[in-house]
Amino acid sequence: MDKRRILKRDISYVAGDLFSEALFCKLYLPGVNSEKADVVMARVLDMQDEFIRRANRPDGKENKKRVKEYYCKLRADLQTEINAIATEIGELSK
């Protein structure tokens, strides 16, 4: 349970950082399209909800191997999504 709680906390921290970065780009950088920034911020919030929901309900709770594989895939998917959103935020300021 502790590891799941830590994972959910990490997801929230990363989502908060990404949201703050997108908000900063929207408010303080000249020439940033506000609508695109809003889309990125909505994507961050959706990502946070999706991954916390996935962390709450692993597949095959009785089989430890399946649970471990599930969380490994969850972490890999999370990292992929974080990288994609970070790239979008980077493109906002161009």
Model-identified regions with their sequence ranges:
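N-terminal acidic leader/helix
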Residues: 5-30
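Short, solvent-exposed segments of well-ordered alpha helices
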Residues: 1-13, 35-38, 65, 69-72, ...
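Amphipathic, well-ordered alpha-helical segments in soluble domains
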Residues: 14-21, 47-50, 81
